[in-house]
Amino acid sequence: MRAVVIESYGGPEVLAICEVPAPEPGPDEVLVDVVASALNRADLLQRMGLYPGPSMEYEVPGLEFAGRVASVGEAVGRWLVGDEVMAITSGGAHAEQAVVHADQAMAVPAGMSLADAGALPEVFITAWDALVLQGGLQPGGTALVHAGASGVGTAAIQLCRSMGAEGGVTASGSKCAACTELGASLAVDYTTDDWLAAVRDHTGGRGVDVVLDVVGGDYLDRNVDALAVGGTIVQGGVMGGGKATFGLGKLLPKRATIVGTVLRGRSLDEKVAVSRAFADEVVPRFEEGMLRVVVDRRFDLDDIAAAHVHMEGNANVGKIALDVRTG
């Protein structure tokens, strides 16, 4: 099969399209003919040697995919050959075939193309898990999402709206308008405006129940200030820096919680549990028209280096999708 292979660590030029052996499904796994996938920040970090993937004969990145079941393991009863499925995975999705545990695979939402479904699982599961399962966001609650125009951000905005919560964001320039169109209750241009002051004003000084932050660095101090009493900061990335200094005393009167989260490093049981819960609770919202995948641009698998360059330019609103094969 054809796959993206990281031959050495560095810039986009280290990525190669190679012929590699197809993976073999285990007894509880399904082999999927991948039609579509998508690019995530973790793929860029893995390419640079900063975010190791699972041990593989060939280092193939990719954290999500959609396609058709090609074969099933002997213990699999949930899926049949030809079923359209999507899934998160720890790696290997930027290839013509991928394997995943049968209970981790999810049915593609009715009416959705495989091209869109390939860009759905990673960001929507990440955002839903962070906001609801880790952050405890409830209907009627309030959230602040940094990097609101990213894949996770555009998913988080819609998830807040779909559950009857308010989702405010920070973004840059014209991206704020795109976030507002998706349903953000507040969109602050962090390059020109004081987002903490805007959050305080928008909430009448109360603050927000959940902050979903993938920036890190010096945002932490202001994130604590932006919290309501009993609020939670969910740290899902450190794009702006992995070190921060803030006064611990701020946490005490707010009874605040800081939670770190990442999907790739979780156990199989945890990934199965979150995938099944997502399939039951969130996938129906796509079928009801409450949620959609926001795709900024599509690239063919052969153009994977250009896709990496595009993401590094930070101009995208939503997902950068990959077309692996036609159909």
Please give the residue ranges for each predicted region.
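Glycine-rich beta-strand-centered segment in the early N-terminal region that forms part
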Residues: 21-38, 48-92
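Short helix-loop-beta connector
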Residues: 80, 110-113, 136-142, 205-206
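N-terminal Rossmann-like NAD(P) cofactor-binding module of classical short-chain dehydrogenase/reductase
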Residues: 86, 144, 211-212
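A structural motif shared across PLP-dependent enzymes of the aminotransferase-like
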Residues: 89-102
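Mid-domain Rossmann-like dinucleotide-binding core that forms the NAD(H)/NADP(H) cofactor-binding site
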Residues: 118-193
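Short amphipathic alpha-helix with an adjacent loop that forms part of the alpha/beta core around
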Residues: 195-205
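Glycine-rich phosphate-binding loop and adjacent beta-alpha segment
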Residues: 218-290, 321-327
